[in-house]
Regions:
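Short glycine/serine/proline-enriched coil/turn segments at secondary-structure junctions
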Residues: 23-26, 42-43, 61-63, 80-81, ...
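Zn2+-dependent peptidoglycan hydrolase active-site motif and core
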Residues: 45-96, 121-129
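Short, well-structured beta-strand-loop connectors
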Residues: 42-54, 97-112
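Conserved beta-strand positions that form and line the central face of beta-propeller blades
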Residues: 34, 72, 88-91, 111, ...
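Short beta-turn/strand-loop junction motif enriched in small, turn-promoting residues
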Residues: 20-22, 40, 56-59, 76-78, ...
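Short glycine/threonine/proline-enriched tight-turn/helix- or strand-capping micro-motif at secondary-structure
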Residues: 14-47, 56, 129
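Short hydrophobic beta/alpha edge segments that flank linear recognition/processing sites
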Residues: 35, 70-73, 104-118
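Acidic, glycine-rich catalytic/binding loops that coordinate metals and/or anionic ligands
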Residues: 4-7, 80-84, 95-107, 126-148
């Protein structure tokens, strides 16, 4: 069986901080996967869908300030038929899409950076379910779809 979503960065870049791991021994779990890549590395949409956010939240929680410049895409449907999932691409140096724009899986949507709460250039890729941000309860392991 092939993957259900595309990897958001070129294949030579691997996950350097996996889903679910605690950060420095804290109880706060990592809600996505991090790919350590140089600034400017192409970020491609893992799924087809509609851009529902593209920019930098100034205030708030969730997909907020800690993610720096980021994009949220509401997927049409994953190949397994599941719906109600959206993908977040965070810490970007450049955003190439606008809210309301439709993208296809594989389209370049931005470039890797180190904006927001970041200690170095990388892409934080996150999947959330439902229509509202639910923190850990709404997060899903992105590797489930990429490695399927």
């Amino acid at each position: 069986m092939g993957s259900l979503a595309m990897k958001p960065v070129p294949n030579k870049w691997i996950v350097t901080f996996p889903y679910g791991v605690t950060y420095k021994g804290t109880r706060k779990k990592h809600k996505g996967v991090d790919y350590s890549c140089p600034k400017g590395t192409s970020v491609n949409s893992a799924v087809s869908g509609k851009v529902v956010f593209a920019g930098w939240h100034k205030v708030g929680r969730g997909w907020g300030r800690s993610y720096g410049q980021h994009i949220i895409i509401d997927n049409d449907r994953f190949k397994d038929g599941s719906a109600g999932l959206w993908a977040g691409y965070c810490h970007l140096s450049k955003i190439n899409v606008k809210v309301g724009e439709r993208v296809n899986a594989g389209d370049q949507i931005g470039e890797v950076g180190s904006t927001g709460n970041s200690t170095g250039s990388h892409l934080h890729f996150e999947i959330q379910s439902g229509r509202l941000w639910k923190g850990w309860a709404g997060s899903r392991n992105p590797q489930r779809w990429i490695d399927a």
